[in-house]
Amino acid sequence: MQQMTIFVISDSSGETALTVAQTAVSQYPTIQVSYQRFPFIQTDSILDGILNLAKKQRAMIFHTLVSPKLSQHVREFAAMNHLQQFDCIQPAMDVMHQATGLEPEGVPGLVHNLNDTYFDRIAAMEFAVTYDDGKDPTGLLKADIVILGVSRTSKTPLSLFLANRNLRVANLPLSPKTQLPDELWQVDPKRIFGLTNRPEILRKIRQERMLSYGLPADSAYSDTAKITEELAYAQKLYKKIGCLVIDVSNKSIEETATLIMESVDYDLIPHSLQD
């Protein structure tokens, strides 16, 4: 069965774009689709982080962004990176403009009330983008949750998904040859989650990754022995830290996120609000 990933990006709840995507997909029953939803996106930095993730996953994009600037950015990014995208709102607004001669308000979320939860979510999304992939280890000390894992264990999409649940997440890639930041040892183990996978599944994921770059599938990156070594190193580290370990093999992002949200001690992160 053919598989596809669809990103739903919106400056509001994303219900409209999700409904359009699901309606279109329903006409193709032989395709297995994974949806990743990113609501309340209103800044360039967050949008860029999501678009780069879409590029990595070769995802199709359905979006409702009332800002012409952000909407155009999605279209241009998709064209430049050979991604399929569908704008679910700008064409409709253009028709309204032509029919009435009036300019749109250009204000996102007019049909939704903004509250503290909304602003917490925006802050969490900004945090996830800033402290993705170990870019700044100081984020480990500021995060509600720290996610560890070797390459291609879904750290970034998981971080963004949890950010949509108002959790501030930093993630750190693991490799036997990479020195761990000192900040990691200052984080409460109850806030750390280690991801693992089966070598054969991870090998396939990495091979597909190489092919998406137009490179040979078989390389040191997708070598089974190297992957096994990386996973063993990660497992040893998790045991030393004393953190919860989650096997993400054959789990969706949503399933892994649910396990984390059910396991996290919210008394340690009082500023994070849950829906």
Swiss-Prot record:
Q: Which keywords describe this protein according to UniProt?
A: Kinase, Nucleotide-binding, Serine/threonine-protein kinase, Transferase
- Any Pfam family hit: Kinase-PPPase
Q: What InterPro entries does the record tag this protein with?
A: Kinase-pyrophosphorylase, PPDK_reg
The EC designation for this entry is 2.7.11.32, 2.7.4.27
Highest taxon above the source species: Bacteria
**Reactions catalysed, as given in the entry:** N(tele)-phospho-L-histidyl/L-threonyl-[pyruvate, phosphate dikinase] + ADP = N(tele)-phospho-L-histidyl/O-phospho-L-threonyl-[pyruvate, phosphate dikinase] + AMP + H(+); N(tele)-phospho-L-histidyl/O-phospho-L-threonyl-[pyruvate, phosphate dikinase] + phosphate + H(+) = N(tele)-phospho-L-histidyl/L-threonyl-[pyruvate, phosphate dikinase] + diphosphate
- Enzyme class, one word? transferase
GO MF term list: ADP binding; ATP binding; phosphotransferase activity, phosphate group as acceptor; protein serine/threonine kinase activity
Q: Which residues bind ADP?
A: 149-156
| Function comment | Bifunctional serine/threonine kinase and phosphorylase involved in the regulation of the pyruvate, phosphate dikinase (PPDK) by catalyzing its phosphorylation/dephosphorylation.
The similarity comment for this entry is: Belongs to the pyruvate, phosphate/water dikinase regulatory protein family. PDRP subfamily.
Q: Which PANTHER family does the entry mention? A: PYRUVATE, PHOSPHATE DIKINASE REGULATORY PROTEIN 1, CHLOROPLASTIC
Q: What is this protein called?
A: Putative pyruvate, phosphate dikinase regulatory protein
Species of provenance = Levilactobacillus brevis (strain ATCC 367 / BCRC 12310 / CIP 105137 / JCM 1170 / LMG 11437 / NCIMB 947 / NCTC 947)
Q: Mind giving the lineage of the organism this protein is from?
A: Bacteria, Bacillati, Bacillota, Bacilli, Lactobacillales
